[in-house]
A protein has these predicted regions:
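Structural/interface elements that position substrates and couple domains in central-metabolism enzymes
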Residues: 1-134
Length: 138
């Protein structure tokens, strides 16, 4: 029997796509989005679209009231996307597994960080003093 290279799919295995049922065994993350307090910072770390995606995957998002105002996102947009709107920066940090910011942590915000939290933000290495790094390592 002679096999031609273009005819090999006839003797090979054919695959069938199958949808897998996913169970919700993944960890639910609590994400805090504080308002940026720097005068020259108009960005926010997560848009309402990002909140919608995270919420749809079972994560809890806390956004500080007015956090998206300078970026032209309203609290209502965040709320409709699935975020809980909170009144204070301190409460944004409370019970959060992850804190996401654009600017580096302020000295006041560092006092609210708990040992088990992950901070995602810029560091601005060139403008930080030694005390910043000492506090962040605690």
């Amino acid at each position: 029997m002679q096999i031609h290279p273009l005819d090999t799919e006839e003797i090979g295995l054919k695959t069938l796509e199958k949808h897998l049922i996913r169970t919700h065994t993944q960890k639910q993350l609590h994400v805090g989005v504080p308002k940026e307090h720097s005068v020259d910072e108009g960005r926010v770390s997560i848009s309402p679209g990002g909140v919608r995606i995270l919420s749809a995957n079972g994560h809890k998002i806390r956004v500080e009231q007015g956090a998206g105002a300078d970026a032209k996102f309203t609290d209502q947009e965040y709320s409709e996307a699935g975020a809980e709107i909170v009144e204070s920066t301190e409460y944004t940090f409370d019970q959060a597994d992850i804190i996401v910011k654009v600017a580096p942590l302020t000295p006041e915000e560092m006092t609210w960080v708990q040992g088990n939290q992950t901070i995602i933000s810029a560091l601005h290495l060139g403008s930080q003093e030694e005390a910043f790094f000492t506090n962040i390592l605690k």
